[in-house]
């Protein structure tokens, strides 16, 4: 098959789509990606891509088409310009027929890896309509509800506008993959999407996340949060729990919290840690993917949290699969699919989002476990991952659905 992927972000930016595309190339498919100019997460165009350099390139067998993109910088105005510059330029490129397969023919299908914003799907709709090809959409961020996390009011004009835009995008898709089971009901009820068009396809973890022997000859219990640090992640709950832990005599000097990642709320969370005068927390910023297994190896358990009162709270963050692939127990302040998965896997402790007291109690429960009991939780996490979230299962399932959609 000849497959055109559309996503505003791609290698060298740190997104899993690169891994998916390269695997499909290994399976014998011709793969191209219509993407933006790298500028995430710092908000500045990468040095190697300035002055119109590398607008077309090939990375590990994947053909890359880069469309005009204004760097997101670090403020709201430029983020909006960033969103619309790619959405419009990529769509115009499709309309004028700029993106072709190696032999000059059309691609067999178009697949949008839909992160934020939902407008990045416009180019895929244009391709579908221009060439009469099936359109697949993999929904990673649900719009317009993702805007609520950023403070947009559900009854406000901005929300209503993007509700209309989102409905058009989702209804234009021939097939929709969702990362969480709860998204199925959302699409059916909010956008009247037929259930048969929606398929549950949970994310997987990169191959480098494998179980490693936990270092037990240490006096501390290390708890690690890894991933994006934004409003949706609600790190405030974890930091307040860290503050409460410091007031518990038998845990004050024993438990340490590690935060690995970057995002719009990083500075605010560092400021909150200072205001709480926390001595049991460390922030490391964004680290290369290759360094993450080392952080996991040093961790006794991994942390996950999300805000409540939103469809976002019911999602299954991709970090959960990475945690489980590494064979790590999970301690979370979260509901929805993550709560279901952790309970089914019997691999950790879950409390409602925002409930600091219950999170503290769960951390204390974990600390009272023996090394053998913690290791058992980790083994159960890895076992569940292999049964439900493995990369081989994901890629085969995706490949089969792409073929079925193309042939139908």
Question: Residues of each region from the PLM?
Answer:
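Carbohydrate-associated surface elements
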Residues: 37, 182, 201-204
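A charged, aromatic-enriched C-terminal amphipathic alpha-helix characteristic of glycosyltransferases
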Residues: 358, 368-403
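N-terminal subdomain of nucleotide-sugar transferases
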Residues: 1-52, 56-57
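Nucleotide-activated donor-binding/catalytic signature segment of Leloir-type glycosyltransferases, i.e.
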Residues: 249-252, 256-260, 267-293
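Nucleotide-sugar-dependent
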Residues: 233, 288-295, 302-324, 331-340
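Conserved donor-binding/catalytic core segment of Leloir-type glycosyltransferases
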Residues: 216-243, 258
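Membrane-proximal helix-turn-helix segments that form the acceptor-binding/catalytic region
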Residues: 119, 126-131, 156-176
């Amino acid at each position: 098959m000849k497959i055109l992927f559309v996503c505003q972000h791609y290698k060298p930016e740190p997104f899993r789509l690169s891994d998916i595309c390269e695997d499909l190339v290994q399976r014998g498919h011709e793969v191209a990606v219509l993407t933006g100019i790298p500028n995430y997460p710092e908000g500045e165009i990468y040095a190697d891509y300035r002055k119109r350099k590398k607008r077309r390139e090939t990375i590990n067998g994947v053909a890359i088409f880069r469309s005009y993109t204004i760097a997101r910088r670090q403020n709201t105005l430029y983020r909006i310009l960033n969103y619309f510059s790619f959405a419009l330029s990529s769509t115009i490129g499709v309309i004028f027929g700029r993106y072709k397969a190696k032999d000059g023919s059309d691609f067999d299908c178009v697949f949008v890896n839909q992160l934020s914003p939902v407008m990045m799907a416009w180019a895929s709709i244009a391709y579908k309509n221009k060439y009469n090809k099936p359109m697949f959409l993999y929904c990673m961020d649900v719009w317009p509800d993702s805007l609520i996390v950023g403070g947009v009011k559900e009854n406000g004009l901005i929300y209503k506008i993007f509700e209309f835009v989102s409905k058009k995008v989702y209804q234009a898709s021939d097939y929709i993959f969702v990362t969480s089971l709860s998204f199925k009901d959302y699409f059916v009820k909010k956008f009247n999407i037929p259930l048969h068009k929606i398929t549950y396809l949970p994310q997987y973890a990169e191959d480098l996340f494998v179980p490693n022997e936990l270092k037990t000859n240490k006096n501390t219990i290390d708890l690690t949060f890894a991933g994006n640090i934004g409003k949706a992640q609600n790190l405030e709950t974890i930091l307040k729990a860290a503050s409460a832990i410091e007031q518990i005599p038998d845990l004050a000097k024993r438990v340490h919290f590690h935060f690995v990642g970057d995002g719009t709320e990083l500075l605010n969370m560092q400021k909150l840690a200072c205001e709480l005068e926390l001595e049991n927390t460390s922030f490391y910023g964004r680290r290369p993917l290759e360094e993450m297994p080392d952080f996991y190896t040093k961790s006794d358990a991994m942390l996950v949290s999300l805000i409540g009162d939103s469809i976002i709270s019911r999602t299954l963050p991709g970090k959960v699969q990475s945690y489980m692939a590494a064979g790590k127990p999970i301690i979370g302040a979260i509901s929805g699919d993550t709560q279901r998965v952790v309970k089914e896997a019997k691999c950790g402790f879950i409390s409602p989002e925002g409930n600091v007291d219950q999170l503290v109690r769960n951390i204390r429960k974990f600390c009272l476990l023996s090394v053998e009991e913690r290791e058992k939780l980790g083994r159960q996490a890895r076992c569940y991952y292999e049964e439900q979230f493995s990369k081989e299962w994901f890629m085969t399932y995706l490949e089969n659905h792409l073929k079925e959609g193309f042939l139908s």
